[in-house]
Curated annotation (Swiss-Prot):
GO terms for molecular function: lipid binding. Signal peptide: none annotated. The gene is MMM1. One of its GO terms (cellular component) is ERMES complex. Residues 1-21 are lumenal. This is Maintenance of mitochondrial morphology protein 1. It comes from Arthroderma otae (strain ATCC MYA-4605 / CBS 113480). Residues 401-410 have a biased composition (Polar residues).
Length: 471
């Protein structure tokens, strides 16, 4: 009999692997819990800028839910059923109120305070006065452009400043009969620019607007400039017969200095509110009527835009202005009288009266604000800097606009159309029609029967070298 075999069992590895797995699992759970606590509980929240960037860059997905579809259908149905006047949301009644505007723009202005004797006094705002340095730069650029335009058009027969002044001074309805034709001998439009400063906003009473009206006051000063106008004319003695005696007169008027307080405010259209006693009626303002009507805006039979209220910019000067004028005169032909004081007083009084009758309180000048709605007729393209060789005296308006820095869109369209026409011409010449557009040499080769020339003429543009010609 065989003895029982004492077989030794190998050591089990399952207990060791189970222990390792348990420890590894516990360790991973601890790491996950620690990472969660560190990054989600004690982590810093993202900044508002990063949240805004992520929201802007996130892809937009349309929602095709039933509720959104029903809402869109109901909204479109309500828009179709409602009147056109109810589509635009109503403007709050306090939108033009002075207090509301000042509160929303964070400007502290003290309104009018009434005294016991029923008189009111204007208080300046508690806001610090503005220096208006940026405004001076803009006004200087505008005046410089006007001066340059006036100099460029000095030789124009219709739109020069000399012809305009001569026509105005020789107006038959205003010029007396004892003054001969007035000839302008010298014009100087100056070299310096007005300086605006100390701007402040005040609230004034206006019966035509709700809550009063805001008015900007700014000091303006113009000195050491060369604004002058020189004329020559003859004084006629029409008794006992017309032009029985003639007295030559030469005058030169120069503005030495001007300073004052400019008042600027916005007033509503006189057509929508009652006419103010200090504002002229639109029927008396022939210059305020547009000379060129916009085809997109309806007009009535008189050519006036109908149904569109216009807001105007009103500006004037306070009565405490200063206008210093220098007048030089020369009277006579042989024994001339120079710089007569009485003539200087008369001319200065006339200029002062002309100025006060137009832009000194309580009289104001109204300028209708233009429409700022974007239109293709006013659209331009900013040109590049490579226009040094372009002549400014060119008669092409597109070239002038390009030289000034902007090119009208119409000019771009014309150039694009011209390039298209040129390309079409090139395509026609490539086809080589012998009866219409072939040159004289090509026609002679065709009449001689030169097939090689014909094949070269009828070769497709862009074909490979050595490719067979089109039959």
């Amino acid at each position: 009999m065989s003895s029982p075999q004492n077989t030794s069992c190998p050591p089990s590895q399952h207990s060791l692997s189970f222990t390792q797995g348990l420890l590894l699992g516990q360790l991973s759970v601890v790491l996950l819990i620690g990472a969660f606590i560190k990054f989600f509980i004690f982590g810093e929240s993202p900044s508002s800028s990063s949240r805004g960037i992520s929201q802007r860059t996130a892809p937009r997905k349309r929602s095709y839910s039933v509720n959104s579809t029903l809402f869109r259908d109901a909204a479109s149905r309500s828009l179709k059923e409602s009147a056109s006047s109810n589509v635009l949301r109503p403007v709050p009644s306090s939108s033009t109120n002075t207090k509301s505007i000042l509160r929303k723009t964070y400007y502290n202005a003290i309104p009018t305070n009434f005294q016991k004797n029923s008189r009111h006094r204007l208080h300046h705002s508690t806001h610090q006065p503005e220096s208006l340095d940026w405004f001076n730069v803009l006004i200087a650029q505008l005046i410089a452009q006007y001066r340059q335009t006036a100099y460029i058009l000095k030789d124009s027969p219709t739109s020069s400043i000399l012809d305009s002044l001569t026509e105005t001074l020789n107006n038959v309805d205003k010029k007396p009969s004892w003054i001969d034709r007035i000839n302008v001998t010298d014009i100087s439009i100056g070299e310096e620019f007005p300086i605006f400063s100390n701007c402040r906003v005040i609230a004034v009473e206006d019966p035509n607007s709700d809550g009063g009206r805001l008015q900007a006051l700014m000091d303006v000063d113009l000195s050491d400039d060369n604004l002058s106008l020189a004329i020559e004319t003859n004084l006629l003695l029409n008794y006992p017969k017309p032009a029985s005696a003639v007295l030559p007169v030469a005058l030169s008027v120069s503005v030495v200095r001007f300073s004052g307080t400019l008042c600027i405010s916005f007033v509503p259209s006189p057509g929508t509110t009652e006419s103010s006693p200090h504002l002229p009626h639109p029927e008396n303002q022939n210059e305020s009527k547009p000379s060129r009507q916009d085809p997109e805006i309806p007009t009535n039979k008189d050519g006036v835009r109908s149904g569109i209220p216009k807001t105007s910019l009103a500006f004037s000067f306070l009565p405490d202005y200063r206008l210093d004028i220098s007048v030089r005169s020369l009277i006579g032909s042989r024994s001339r009288l120079q710089d007569v004081p009485k003539v200087a007083q008369l001319v200065e009084a006339r200029v002062q009266s002309w100025f006060e009758d137009r832009v000194v309180e309580p009289r104001v000048q109204l300028v209708a604000l233009p429409g700022i709605w974007p239109r293709m007729g006013r659209t331009g393209v900013r040109a590049q800097e490579d226009h040094d060789a372009v002549s400014i005296d060119s008669e092409d308006p597109a070239t002038k606009a390009t030289h000034s820095g902007f090119t009208p869109v119409n000019a771009n369209r014309d150039g694009l159309q011209a390039s298209r026409d040129l390309n079409m011409e090139g395509l026609r010449y490539r086809r080589g029609n012998a009866g219409d557009e072939a040159t004289t040499d090509e026609y002679e080769r065709l009449t001689r029967g030169d097939t090689q020339s014909v094949g070269e003429q009828l070769r497709i543009p862009g074909s490979l070298p050595g490719a067979p010609a089109v039959a």
